[in-house]
Amino acid sequence: MTQFAFVFPGQGSQSVGMLAEMAANYPIVEETFAEASAALGYDLWALTQQGPAEELNKTWQTQPALLTASVALWRVWQQQGGKMPALMAGHSLGEYSALVCAGVINFADAVRLVEMRGKFMQEAVPEGTGGMSAIIGLDDASIAKACEESAEGQVVSPVNFNSPGQVVIAGHKEAVERAGAACKAAGAKRALPLPVSVPSHCALMKPAADKLAVELAKITFSAPTVPVVNNVDVKCETDAAAIRDALVRQLYNPVQWTKSVEFIAAQGVEHLYEVGPGKVLTGLTKRIVDTLTASALNEPAALSAALTQ
């Protein structure tokens, strides 16, 4: 079997009805959601299957839902005798999914932790004052320059380096709008405002990170059974304090996804499996390293194909 890695998606990959087909085939999916529901005090499976979407899309509910979906798929993989990946990585919230699957954080602890992470993020910025935009077709340096020149005393910066030519910026809503216009003037094909209420991974998230650090200190961290590439430094940490520190800094620093995928490829990995709903990371992979292949493990046929590789 070729060397493979598991990657875990972040916010934006959720949808009402996600994993329904997997749950119909593998009871462990609903069992995993039942565990999460017990930790949270509400029926998370009902929310993911019935919605409404505006509830599922609230960040403090999105985050536990995506984490649980990824852990459920990982458990299906293990139950079916799937081999261990060479590496793991997750995009933003997905880093928590990776750490659970690598045995670093207990699942119930992680579910409660990411719910709090979502609440802290929402509390850090008053509703309607933050924004995010995807900048398509402009180099990283030009985007950084546009952000610097558009700040005017407010916060705006690149926050997700998703693939070459696809970078997300975040900060104060007006500054994001100015920077988007500056990026277009500098040659960007598009500046797409994203329908989010929280400007993730920018300096406005520092108060949320400080609160998160307090909660992270209460949780036991174990050594990873599989190396996890972190978002903030593109490193595989084994020490609990270093993993905690990277999670705190992740909240107000950019997600280095392009570099993470390049790092994974440099370790001899040839295929990425996306473990979670949607196919966002699968779509980004080829744009980052064209020799890498990728596929999503969220449907029974795709899972069966992967298990027979």
Swiss-Prot record:
GO CC entries: cytosol
Alphabetical keyword list: Acyltransferase, Fatty acid biosynthesis, Fatty acid metabolism, Lipid biosynthesis, Lipid metabolism, Transferase
Active site: 92, 201
EC number: 2.3.1.39
Keyword Lipid biosynthesis attached: yes
Top EC class for this record: transferase
Catalytic activity: holo-[ACP] + malonyl-CoA = malonyl-[ACP] + CoA
Keyword Transferase tagged: yes
GO biological process, one term: fatty acid biosynthetic process
Pathway note: Lipid metabolism; fatty acid biosynthesis
GO molecular function: [acyl-carrier-protein] S-malonyltransferase activity
Stored NCBIfam families: fabD
Family: Belongs to the FabD family.
Name the UniProt record assigns to this protein: Malonyl CoA-acyl carrier protein transacylase
Species this chain originates from: Salmonella typhimurium (strain LT2 / SGSC1412 / ATCC 700720)
Gene name, Swiss-Prot/TrEMBL: fabD
